[in-house]
Regions:
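Active-site adenylate/phosphate-handling loop in enzymes that bind or generate adenylated species
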Residues: 15-85, 130-143
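A short alpha-helix-loop-beta-strand transition element characteristic
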Residues: 86-94
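Short catalytic/ligand-gating loop segments at beta-alpha or beta-beta junctions
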Residues: 41-42, 93-95
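Single conserved hydrophobic/aromatic residue that forms the stacking wall/gate
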Residues: 1-9, 13
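A generic structural signal for well-ordered coil/turn residues at beta-strand boundaries
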Residues: 34, 95-98
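Flexible C-terminal active-site loop/helix
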Residues: 109-141
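Short acidic, glycine/serine/threonine-rich loops at helix termini
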Residues: 10, 49-52, 113
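A charged, well-structured terminal subsegment
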Residues: 98-113
């Protein structure tokens, strides 16, 4: 069933809303560093938030190109790359991350952009402070 009110919509789309704000934060740092694009490690279909439809919803908030070199890779290929570039050990640390915390019982594979934007409108009062806090407390790791 589809959520009928904004609170229910917000709950159902929590992960997508979070991913959209993560994209905004990433774009902030990319602009600050003079980058012309973002690069992510997403792979199509690995998780519910990485369907083509949901990736388009995530992209919608970003004003620069988003490249996904792992888009067609399977999990083992991505693990091999992570080991090669030195990010694998960090990726398996036993901490709850945003995706773990916001896992819905029944993940949405085809988000509704109109409802997501309506839910985001209800967050505007607090989100600016939270984004500033996230930006100010971000640790930048340079990968070679």
């Amino acid at each position: 069933s589809t959520p009928s009110n904004s609170s229910a919509a917000s709950d159902v789309y929590k992960r997508q809303i979070m991913r959209r704000y993560m994209m905004k934060i990433a774009e902030h740092f990319a602009n600050e560093g003079g980058s012309l694009a973002l690069i992510t490690g997403e792979s199509i279909g690995q998780v519910a938030s990485q369907t083509i439809h949901n990736l388009a919803i995530t992209n919608e908030v970003c004003n620069m190109p988003v490249f996904r070199p792992c888009i067609g890779m399977d999990k083992q290929e991505i693990v091999d790359i992570a080991e090669k570039i030195g990010t694998f050990e960090t990726s398996i640390q036993p901490f709850e991350d945003c995706c773990t915390i916001f896992v819905a019982k029944h993940p949405v594979t085809k988000g509704n952009l109109k409802r997501i934007k309506k839910s985001e409108e209800h967050l505007e009062d607090v989100i600016d402070d939270l984004m500033k806090e996230a930006i100010d407390s971000t640790e930048i790791i340079h990968v070679k």
